[in-house]
């Protein structure tokens, strides 16, 4: 005779006794085993619920951190473009630079340079024309309100 405990998952059937089969487990023992199974299932549910709560808290936190890093990188690219064009404007006669020149010098993509120029208040986008008057390329130029006002903002540089 096979006991009811052996038909339940997680139980191993004992080998047959040569004299007879093992005695059937008492009802009290079976109810205790069932109670342990229910408790372990409840603990797993509580554990999974706890993990779900932690994930619900961490998800927006990670999203805010990722977005703030994205904004910081955009700002750094804009500042790098502005400072390069400012220095070139002070030490060169034209101060106009094409995208190819800026890509090679700053190590940024064209899309990043265009995005930074659109967000900047001091960079103007102009069109360079050939002798026939047709547009050839877009050039960027640093155009502040007053160059003398911009000089003190450059850290580490003495005024001359």
UniProtKB/Swiss-Prot annotation:
Keyword terms, alphabetized: Membrane, Plasmid, Transmembrane, Transmembrane helix
Species this protein is from: Sinorhizobium fredii (strain NBRC 101917 / NGR234)
Membrane topology classification: Single-pass membrane protein
The name this protein goes by in its record: Uncharacterized protein y4lN
One GO cellular component term noted in the UniProt record for this chain: membrane
Compartments where found: Membrane
Domain of life: Bacteria
Transmembrane segments: 47-67
């Amino acid at each position: 005779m096979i006991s009811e405990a052996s038909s339940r998952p997680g139980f191993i059937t004992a080998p047959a006794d040569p004299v007879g089969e093992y005695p059937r487990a008492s009802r009290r023992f079976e109810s205790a085993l069932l109670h342990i199974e229910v408790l372990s299932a409840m603990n797993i549910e509580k554990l999974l619920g706890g993990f779900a709560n932690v994930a619900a808290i961490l998800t927006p936190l990670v999203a805010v951190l990722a977005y703030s890093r994205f904004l910081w990188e955009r700002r750094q690219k804009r500042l790098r473009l502005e400072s390069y064009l400012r220095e070139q404007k002070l030490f060169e006669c034209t101060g106009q630079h094409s995208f190819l020149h800026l890509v090679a010098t700053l190590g940024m993509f064209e899309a990043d340079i265009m995005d930074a120029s659109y967000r900047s208040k001091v960079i103007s986008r102009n069109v360079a024309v050939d002798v026939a008057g047709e547009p050839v390329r877009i050039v960027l130029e640093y155009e502040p309100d007053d160059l003398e006002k911009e000089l003190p903002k450059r850290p580490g540089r003495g005024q001359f």
